[in-house]
Amino acid sequence: MHIGIGLPNQVRNVDTAIVPRWAARAEEAGFSTLATIGRYAYPGLSDTVALAAAAGATTTIGLLSAVLLAPTWPGALLAKEIAGIDGVSGGRLTLGIGIGSREEEFTVPGHGLRGRGARLDADLATYRDVWGGTGPNPAVPSGTRQVPMLFGGSAAAAIDRMARWGEGYIGGSLPAAMTAPSFEAAQRAWRQAGRQGTPKLVALAYFALGDAETARANIRDFYRMAPEAIADNVVLCTTPEMINRSIADYTELGIDELIFVPATDDLDEVARLADITTVRV
């Protein structure tokens, strides 16, 4: 199982200038992937900006949105943005897609909460068309690749989209026992869709190996509008033992990659996590 690390782009009032340095240190430490968390109505750094900054500060580490709230965007515009980030990174981006559930995230006229599932279904075809240079006025340079997509969400529709359009599934930042049914559903849907091989499975867990009190406050703030079943069960690893327990739990589930998401923007957290996980990276 690979070990990745998140960017602190959605830590409340993040020092945004730290993102490129965080990305460079993560690559130097040997992590497999840099991931972002996506929200609009929150005082953080948008995932597309964070991913672009990380792309410019690194050369080899993978990049992942985990997850970007795709229905909040006009489809063609998002497809162009994603193609651009993937291009400047040298083809290192994977687009992780979520559908969103908070009314305040949906601010673009015509892109409200209602109807977001149907919009996303249509937009997925738009992404493919844009990346393929379809039409008399292509929106992306020739040679743009089809950016691989992963999907988050536990609803049946999300799992079905993953099986039709994606390369794998991203679980929520909950205990392994709570996310296991969704991972199993993703694998089952993949087989039922007649897909070859197996879906890539990615798990998330928050961590804070420095200021645990601030980290807990940040997570409570971020999830204050989430359902209690989520807000009360978000995983926050604050000790080496908890990090190792999460690794063991997800290894047992057969997960391909576990990404530890920072709950603070303390740059030293990169080294602290690497000191624990280095033998597995």
Sequence positions of predicted segments:
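Active-site-adjacent structural elements that line small-molecule/cofactor binding pockets in enzymes
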Residues: M1-V281
